[in-house]
Amino acid sequence: MKTIAIMNQKGGIGKTMTAASIAYLLGEEQGKKVLLVDADQQGNVSMLYDRYKPEGIGMSELLERHRSVGGSYKTTDLIQTTPYHNVDIITANGYLMRTNMNLLLNEKEDQILRFAAAMLEVQDVYDYCVVDCGLLLDMTVTNVLVATDLVILPVKIGGFEIEAIANMDEQLEDLRSLNNRIRMKILMTMRQKNKTSLQVEAWLKESSGQDCFVTAVRRSIIAEKATMQRVPLPKFSKNCIVTQDYRNVVTELLKDMEG
């Protein structure tokens, strides 16, 4: 199982839509077995997959009450099926805020290795684990990154994207002593075809030294409508331009991850 974390510390850049769309397309169209993990206390990707419950069990229990840390839950106890072929989910809700605090106060060495330990139980069940991370590099996200193969960094051109990339680079470098295989790939989202955007896009791809997806995800009102309807974009509109872009992203992703 390969783990892909979608994260950026800036909101409004299509992070959750990216996670939801990649998971859907890998499962429904590519026939891959996918475990979608919500690691954001807002629970937005859980909502898009119609599995959000304010009092439900999921990511909090995985990190605090899993049998690998003396609890009673197996990983499979916390996995739910979704309405979509080949995609299962571990949900999140507001309890993750409490979980982050509890892990921060816990001085045991395993506090940032808990997600990795729990995923060992299902590593032969799924082809991909796709994680929608929260905006903060908290204990939940740190746990995820320790187990991650690829970080996809969605970047919206037009404000502080250079700083966001530099910050993420620095944070991942700090984690490489625990996970030396982790790497980052930039995905341009909400692309608008104007001079400034095209210049920054060209710099990112050609001169920044960063690994970037060739595909840039365009901006469309259809994506916003899908979010309002709480449905993954490729299900809401199979042939819209943004779905086509994400389909191309998945093609690139599979070539990258599988050769």
Spans of model-derived segments:
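P-loop NTP-binding core
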Residues: M1-G259
